[in-house]
Amino acid sequence: MNGKIVQIIGPVIDVEFKGADLPKIYDALKVDELDLTLEVQQQVGDNVVRAIAMGSSDGLKRGMAVSNTGEAISVPVGKPTLGRIFDVLGNPIDNAGPVESEEKMTIHRPAPAFDELAASQELLETGVKVIDLICPFAKGGKVGLFGGAGVGKTVNMMELIRNIAIEHSGYSVFAGVGERTREGNDFYYEMEESGVLDKVALVYGQMNEPPGNRLRVALTGLTMAEYFRDEGRDILFFVDNIYRYTLAGTEVSALLGRMPSAVGYQPTLSQEMGQIQERITSTKTGSITSIQAVYVPADDLTDPAPATTFAHLDATVVLNRSIAETGIYPAIDPLDSTSRQLDPLVVGSEHYDTARGVQETLQRYKELKDIIAILGMDELSEEDRSLVARARKMQRFFSQPYFVAKVFTGEDGRYVPLKETLRGFKMIISGELDDIPEQAFMYAGDIDEVLEKAKKYKD
């Protein structure tokens, strides 16, 4: 079934199909002369469909022949995808030959039915102190890493992948949505070096790609993850960055002539976000644990894009620029970050009480900061002074050397088990470590390392 191009406006292509059945919404069309795929978005009348190009529209001209494939974009799935890099159409882009995959699946699929869903209470240990204590992850849950430009979303994401993918021996899928090509390259070699590349499928649609690619690349990665889940596996699904998915949707929406809504976003923002997020879920067959980086424009968490994402997550890890400015990394805010798992019935009363004790101390310190700035420490009561000292130790103990940052810091990373994290913070809260200098807590792993550092300072 052939049609011809009648209008080209950037990545938006109008195709006329005379006297034939019109392609369905989301059908893939092929411009054979240029090997370009288009995806149908609208039927505009007079036998014309409006499609978005999944690649550059350079070289297209009116009158070119277009064929209808009769189905949505399909991508390879299953074990042959592991260790390979794909583009949005499922073509390998790592110069390692074709993918020998028997099976292909369309990227547009319905979310699992309500009665197929399964909730999990099992915790997923990450080895990062602040996350395991304050906003623990659930196996099969959804986590968002929120942060502005340059506060460490990608580094935190890479550290979590390294820690979880190495400790958890299952398969992972990584979708690079609208991020820098350099980061994708670094990530590939990082995976290769740590020996987990043969368990990861990578799908990239970088910043330089047209909006159609960036809008659909997350669905390509998700389709690969869903296939593994439906085989009965526990899958890790990483998205960096879900905001770029929203942004690509905004661009496509404007190109298709829809009226923008708040702050210029597409009117279908929450529906598009819901469509992808409802598919990232765990069923009775298998689980998808998803970690998504979310860029926060101008550090404003009330912006419609991050605000819409919040509603879908089980845990939110909020990165704070003011913490990064004090030189404490990871710059995760223990007062802003939340998790549904931080419940005494899930994590146990010891963990819950320790986490809340830490948050209370830090909150009180935050309230006292204004008084300290105006009057100085001397005006505080003895009790408040010791509370401030403990809070500062907690802030520094939250810092931690990362494995993936070794190239920058020259220091080996630390994986801190949850029980060690709890032991350390309980000792700080109880006042056992009041005589240890606060610099000993900076970039230490567990509490034993802090005590060793303190000994060196004394000597």
Swiss-Prot record:
**What's the chief localization of this chain?**
membrane
Write down what this protein is called. ATP synthase subunit beta
Q: Which InterPro entries match?
A: AAA+_ATPase (IPR003593), ATP-synt_VA_C (IPR055190), ATP_synth_F1_bsu (IPR005722), ATPase_a/bsu_AS (IPR020003), ATPase_alpha/beta_chains (IPR050053), ATPase_F1/V1/A1_a/bsu_N (IPR004100), ATPase_F1/V1/A1_a/bsu_N_sf (IPR036121), ATPase_F1/V1/A1_a/bsu_nucl-bd (IPR000194)
**Any idea which UniProt keywords this protein has?**
ATP synthesis, ATP-binding, Cell inner membrane, Cell membrane, CF(1), Hydrogen ion transport, Ion transport, Membrane, Nucleotide-binding, Translocase, Transport
| Cited Pfam families | ATP-synt_ab (PF00006), ATP-synt_ab_N (PF02874), ATP-synt_VA_C (PF22919)
Query: What is the membrane topology listed in the Swiss-Prot or TrEMBL record?
Result: Peripheral membrane protein
Q: Into which family does the record put it?
A: Belongs to the ATPase alpha/beta chains family.
What's the EC number here? 7.1.2.2
Residues holding ATP:
G147, G148, A149, G150, V151, G152, K153, T154
Q: Which GO terms describe its cellular component?
A: plasma membrane; proton-transporting ATP synthase complex
Q: Which CDD domains match?
A: ATP-synt_F1_beta_C, ATP-synt_F1_beta_N, F1-ATPase_beta_CD
NCBIfam families from the entry?
atpD
Q: Could you tell me what reaction this enzyme catalyses?
A: ATP + H2O + 4 H(+)(in) = ADP + phosphate + 5 H(+)(out)
Location(s), subcellular: Cell inner membrane
Subunit structure, interactors included: F-type ATPases have 2 components, CF(1) - the catalytic core - and CF(0) - the membrane proton channel. CF(1) has five subunits: alpha(3), beta(3), gamma(1), delta(1), epsilon(1). CF(0) has three main subunits: a(1), b(2) and c(9-12). The alpha and beta chains form an alternating ring which encloses part of the gamma chain. CF(1) is attached to CF(0) by a central stalk formed by the gamma and epsilon chains, while a peripheral stalk is formed by the delta and b chains.
Record PANTHER family: ATP SYNTHASE, ATP SYNTHASE SUBUNIT BETA, MITOCHONDRIAL
Q: Does the keyword Cell inner membrane apply?
A: yes
Q: Could you tell me the superkingdom of the organism this chain comes from? A: Bacteria
This protein's record includes keyword Cell inner membrane: yes
Q: What does this protein do?
A: Produces ATP from ADP in the presence of a proton gradient across the membrane. The catalytic sites are hosted primarily by the beta subunits.
